[in-house]
Amino acid sequence: MKAMILAAGLGTRLRPLTDDRPKALVEVAGRTLLEITLSRLSALGIRDVIINVHHFADKIVDYLKAHGNFGLRIEISREDVLLDTGGGLKTAGWFFLEDSVAADEPFILHNVDVLSTIDLRHMVRVHLEKKALATLAAQQRGSSRLLLFDENLRLCGRRAGRDLEPEIVCPSANLRPLAFCGVHVISPRFLRMMQEDGVFSIIDSYLRLAARGESILGFPADEYYWRDVGKLEQVQQAAEDYKQKLFS
């Protein structure tokens, strides 16, 4: 099984920590966000990872080299221009199609600035059992941006802001708003179905395909610890969470 870590962001909300380093190398409890994410993936048995980079890209490459790639096979996908989640995955898509075995296995797509105890093994198992095209970890929590699911947890739309009208692609009587956790399980055939080009959000692709009847599913993650660490105060809170053994 393979994985991709999204690590190309500028990390502007983490300044001054990101004045001299990429977001992926910001530390929580003595470990970088990149190391924490790689450790989670490695625990799942993943040995092949691709990481997209942009801001201070060479520092990530040097860091990985200094740590022997943490015993993994790691490829780097450089972005001269930030491509967002969809464009980033599409550019790196070759990595998941390079051999016949990988082309049949789902892969993990994981934001580097997300800490969680989400059971990735269980999430992959559910993805396979449901024969989903993509499975998205999501929680009931406050957020200005929400994904909308039906009673069977099929993606039906999104609300991009509190003051914006929701975008509905699959009308349903009882839509359930959930906040996305930045963790996906994706079937490789999704890569061949991405029609969007350039800079685009992967959610755009998901919604277009959901409107066609493709199975884009939610994975309930309310029972797990989760924290976005894209802001300075969130990094500080995550350090406290670590002391309280909320994650490891």
Regions found by a protein language model. Give the residues of each.
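Glycine-rich N-terminal loop/short-helix segment of MobA-like nucleotidyltransferase
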Residues: M1-A29, S42-L44, P220
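Conserved N-terminal catalytic core of the sugar/cofactor nucleotidyltransferase
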Residues: K2-I5, E27, R31-N111, H122, ...
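A generic "binding-loop/recognition-motif" signal
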Residues: L10, R21, F56, G142-S143, ...
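Hydrophobic packing residues within well-ordered alpha-helices of enzyme cores
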Residues: L14, I60-L64, A238
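Catalytic-core segments of class I nucleotidyltransferases/pyrophosphorylases
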Residues: I46, V101, F107-I108, L115, ...
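A short, conserved acidic/glycine-rich loop-to-beta-strand motif
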Residues: K130-Q140
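Short beta-strand-to-turn element immediately C-terminal to the catalytic PLP-Schiff-base lysine
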Residues: L148-D150
